[in-house]
Amino acid sequence: MRHGNGLRKLNRTSSHRLAMLRNMCNSLIQHEAIKTTVPKAKELRRVVERLLTLGKTPTLANKRLAFDRLRDRDNVVKLFGVLGPRYAARPGGYTRILKMGFRVGDNAPMAFVELVDRPDPSAAVEVTEDKA
């Protein structure tokens, strides 16, 4: 019986699913917004919320746990140096899932996953234009 097992299998083996979620977590932490399908976005939210909660308390044990899950040193540094302090006062709900229609090839429902309170990308473009 599968009572209490709420994990979506996403039609993948366990190793493929783990690698896919790890790659999506790394992309979301690096770019702070990604585009994916709705079921993948909902599973990604579960994993990323826990990682961002780890990032709020920068202990050595938490850094090792985050590195064990991400396997990317730059993203672990960003998680504890940038994202952790940004969300220190927020008690959860670090991600936002916006539905954005259907994919052209197979009509799969697509979603835009982003971190809330992220810097506006248009503001960064304006700053670089002023310097040039």
From Swiss-Prot:
PANTHER family attached to this UniProt entry: LARGE RIBOSOMAL SUBUNIT PROTEIN BL17M, RIBOSOMAL PROTEIN L17
Protein name according to UniProt: Large ribosomal subunit protein bL17
Family that this chain belongs to: Belongs to the bacterial ribosomal protein bL17 family.
Pfam families for this protein: Ribosomal_L17
Keyword Ribosomal protein: yes
Keywords assigned by UniProt, alphabetized: Ribonucleoprotein, Ribosomal protein
Chain's gene name: rplQ
Gene3D superfamilies listed in its UniProt record: Ribosomal protein L17 (3.90.1030.10)
GO molecular function: structural constituent of ribosome
SUPFAM superfamilies tied to this protein: Prokaryotic ribosomal protein L17
Organism: Leptothrix cholodnii (strain ATCC 51168 / LMG 8142 / SP-6)
Gene Ontology annotations for the cellular component aspect, listed alphabetically: cytosolic large ribosomal subunit
GO biological process: translation
Quaternary structure and interacting proteins, as annotated: Part of the 50S ribosomal subunit. Contacts protein L32.
